[in-house]
Each structure stands twice: as structure tokens, then as C-alpha cells.
């Protein structure tokens, strides 16, 4: 029994993961996750909309040039007289400058909309970063839990193997019956089945870890100190969580920007009812080597004013459509405000309850270890303890350890979920802590 206790102590103090190593895993996902990198490229693309909108205020310059050559042969006049061959050669060069003067503030509103869309892309990137970091932390702590699950089940198999050996010897001495040995053998078979299932779950957890974090999954993480050594700067109370989420929750901020963009879309549609003005300057040079005028230069300055009168009702319908979209965005915003409040309350509740559950499972493990050690010693000393009582105590100990490992996993993940819902789950914040 002393050997087993020493073995457990050695296992649970090996392969300790520090906060620095944990951050390495998160940083790998932050840099290498394909979904996050795709969001970064989307941000770069959306950012170019500002330059595209600004181009509406700048002149457009065209340079054109053409050259033609025409050869005429086998010519005759009306009476059939043959005419000499001739050729026509011409060149034309021109430069044209177009400048929009007024578009009913359409260009101004397009720039404003582009800036809002860039802010929106920034928030979408932040939201994606939070999702990837949360997925990475969840994958990591899930891997820790599944590795512990395998180790606990392996230790359980080892204990039952020793019990079967001990019971076989005691059966030969007549201390127990064949039924007692059969109970031990059945428990060993059940322990092996659970061990195989735990290994299968571990393979799935490793695969998920490598998919999200983009690094090989560690083979052993028995003791994890990351959640204890990282200060996540969580809200101190539910009211504090509400304040943070209202200011920083990306989902809520995105909904607010969606509404502002819908307002700009209405303004852009309204500008299409306004008159527009533009000016054009063209300078051209023509050369015709076959005509009486060899060369001619021409300059043209043209001002154009366009007043929209009727377009088959298209403008009115487009404006109505944008107004309906604006109303839709406002309704969605109100719903998301309530949704974020609910998510914040739920995340806070899960965080507090998981903390209580963790403390309860720690007490459960401590009590189960004491009970199992006492029952096993009494059984080995030939006391009145039965084989079934030993099996039950070991099953209770295994379940207590697995429940505690799961509670540790749930508590750690609940912290990151709460940090995400208040909009503070960033790699920079984690490194500062």
C-alpha cells in the first residue's frame, strides 16, 4: 500500500505545466490558426474600402491614343478610268480629366460608411481572436482532464491486478471464496474497459488540441499550475461583469456598428435624389497625312449637371429597403443587448458554481482516499471487510478523482468564458497578468 501511495505522489508531481508554457500554446494558436489568419486577411481587405471611397473625390485621368492606316487600290471612276492608288494615315492622341463636383453628399457618406466597416472588421477580428483563444484554452484543459482520466484508470487497473493476485493467493489459503475472486476479476475487466475508453477519449482530445493550437499535443500533463499562476483579472462581481460586457463585448459592439452602418446606407440612398455636377477637360491632337489639314489640336471643357427626375421608382424602393434594414438592425441590437446580459449572468453563475463544485470534489477525493486506504488495510489484514466493499471503495475513489479532474477543467474554462463575454480575453491581457 505504501508503494502505491508513493507511486501516486510521484505521478502527481511530474510534468508540471507553468503559465509560461500554457501561454506558448495560446500564442501558437494566435499566430497559426487558419480561421484567425483568414479573419486578419478579411480585415486588410475591408480596410481598403476607405481608399476606394476617397477616390470618389479625386479626379479621373484617361490617356488614349490611336493610329490607323488605310491603303486604297484598284480604284476606278464612273466612266471606268483607273485611278492611282493612295493611302490614308492618321493618328489621334488625347488626355481627358473628369472631376466630380457634387453628388448630394454621397461620397462623404461613403467614406463614413467605409470607416464604420473598418471598425466593424476590427471588432470581428477581435471577436475571432477571443473565440480562438477560448477554443485553445478549452482544448488545452480538456487535454489535461483526459490525460488525468487515463492515468487514474491506469492506476485503477494496477490496483485491481494486485487485488486479483492477492485474492488468488488468499483463495488457496481458504481465506476467501471463489465468489470473492470472481468479483475481483470482474472488477479488473471493468477497469480495463474504462481504461480503453479513456485512451480513446484522449486520442480525440489530442487531435482537437493539434487542430486548434497547431502544435503537437504533449504526451503527459499531470499537474497543471497555469490556472493558478495566471491572473485573469476577472470581474469582482456580477454588476462589474455587466459594466465590462456593456463596454467591451465584441458581439454587442458589432451590433451597434451594424445599426450605424444601416443609418449611413439610408443617407447614401437619399443622396441619389440630389442633383450631381461634374466637369471634364479634354485635350486632343489629331494628325491626318492624307487630308488638306495635316494636324489639329483641340481643347474641350465641359460642365455637366444631372438632376434625377424619374427612374421607374427604383430610388424610392431602394430608400424604403434601406429604411427597413435600419429598423431590422435596431431590433437585432435590442435583442443582442438582452442576449449579452443573459450570457454575462450565465457565465458569472457558471464561474461561481464551478468554483463551489471544485471545492466539493476536492473534499470528496480526500474523504474517498482515507476511506479506501482504511478499507483496503482492513481487508488485507483479514478483518471483516468484504471484497465487494473494497471494490466499492476503489470505484468511489476513481469516480471522485475523475470528478475532481473534470471540476478543475470546468473551473478553468469558466474563467476564460467569463473573460470572453466581458470582452477582455486577449493575448496581450493574458501576458500582462
PLM feature spans:
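Amphipathic alpha-helical coiled-coil segments
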Residues: 38-53, 128, 132-151, 162, ...
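Sec-dependent N-terminal signal peptides
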Residues: 3-13
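Transmembrane beta-barrel architecture of outer-membrane proteins
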Residues: 90-92, 138, 183, 298-300
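Bacterial Sec-pathway N-terminal export signals of envelope proteins
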Residues: 18-64, 72, 217, 221-260, ...
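Periplasmic alpha-helical coiled-coil/stalk elements that build and connect Gram-negative outer-membrane
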Residues: 24, 131-244, 347-350, 354
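Small/polar (Gly/Ser/Thr/Ala-rich) solvent-exposed segments
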Residues: 37, 60-87, 98-127, 253, ...
Amino acid at each position: 500500500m505504501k508503494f502505491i501511495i508513493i507511486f501516486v505522489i510521484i505521478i502527481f508531481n511530474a510534468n508540471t505545466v507553468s503559465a509560461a508554457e500554457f501561454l506558448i500554446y495560446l500564442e501558437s494558436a494566435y499566430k497559426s490558426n487558419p480561421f484567425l489568419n483568414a479573419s486578419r486577411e478579411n480585415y486588410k481587405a475591408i480596410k481598403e474600402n476607405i481608399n476606394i471611397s476617397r477616390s470618389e473625390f479625386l479626379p479621373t485621368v484617361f490617356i488614349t491614343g490611336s493610329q490607323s492606316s488605310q491603303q486604297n487600290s484598284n480604284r476606278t471612276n464612273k466612266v471606268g478610268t483607273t485611278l492611282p492608288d493612295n493611302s490614308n494615315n492618321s493618328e489621334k492622341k488625347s488626355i481627358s480629366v473628369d472631376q466630380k463636383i457634387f453628388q448630394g453628399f454621397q461620397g462623404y457618406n461613403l467614406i463614413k460608411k467605409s470607416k464604420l466597416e473598418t471598425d466593424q472588421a476590427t471588432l470581428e477580428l477581435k471577436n475571432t481572436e477571443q473565440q480562438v483563444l477560448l477554443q485553445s484554452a478549452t482544448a488545452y484543459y480538456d487535454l489535461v482532464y483526459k490525460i488525468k482520466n487515463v492515468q487514474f484508470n491506469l492506476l485503477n487497473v494496477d490496483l485491481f491486478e494486485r487485488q486479483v493476485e492477492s485474492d488468488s493467493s488468499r483463495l488457496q489459503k481458504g481465506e476467501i471464496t471463489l465468489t470473492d475472486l470472481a468479483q475481483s476479476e470482474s472488477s479488473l475487466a471493468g477497469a480495463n474497459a474504462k481504461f480503453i475508453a479513456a485512451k480513446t477519449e484522449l486520442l480525440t482530445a489530442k487531435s482537437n488540441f493539434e487542430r486548434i493550437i497547431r502544435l503537437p499535443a504533449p504526451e503527459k500533463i499531470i499537474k497543471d499550475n497555469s490556472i493558478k499562476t495566471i491572473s485573469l483579472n476577472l470581474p469582482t462581481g456580477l454588476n462589474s461583469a455587466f459594466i465590462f460586457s456593456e463596454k467591451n463585448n465584441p458581439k454587442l459592439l458589432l451590433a451597434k456598428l451594424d445599426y450605424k452602418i444601416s443609418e449611413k446606407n439610408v443617407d447614401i440612398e437619399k443622396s441619389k435624389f440630389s442633383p450631381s455636377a461634374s466637369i471634364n477637360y479634354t485635350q486632343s491632337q489629331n494628325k491626318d497625312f492624307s487630308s488638306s489639314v495635316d494636324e489639329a489640336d483641340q481643347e474641350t471643357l465641359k460642365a455637366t449637371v444631372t438632376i434625377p427626375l424619374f427612374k421607374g421608382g427604383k430610388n424610392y424602393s431602394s430608400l424604403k429597403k434601406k429604411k427597413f434594414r435600419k429598423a431590422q438592425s435596431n431590433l437585432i441590437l435590442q435583442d443582442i443587448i438582452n442576449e449579452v446580459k443573459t450570457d454575462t449572468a450565465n457565465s458569472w453563475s457558471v464561474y461561481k458554481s464551478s468554483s463551489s463544485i471544485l471545492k466539493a470534489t476536492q473534499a470528496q477525493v480526500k474523504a474517498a482516499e482515507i476511506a479506501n486506504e482504511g478499507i483496503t488495510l482492513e481487508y488485507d489484514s483479514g478483518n471483516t471487510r468484504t471484497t465487494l466493499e473494497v471494490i466499492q471503495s476503489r470505484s468511489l475513489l476513481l469516480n471522485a478523482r475523475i470528478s475532481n479532474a473534470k471540476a478543475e477543467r470546468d473551473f478553468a474554462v469558466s474563467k476564460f468564458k467569463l473573460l470572453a463575454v466581458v470582452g477582455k480575453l486577449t493575448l496581450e491581457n493574458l501576458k500582462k497578468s
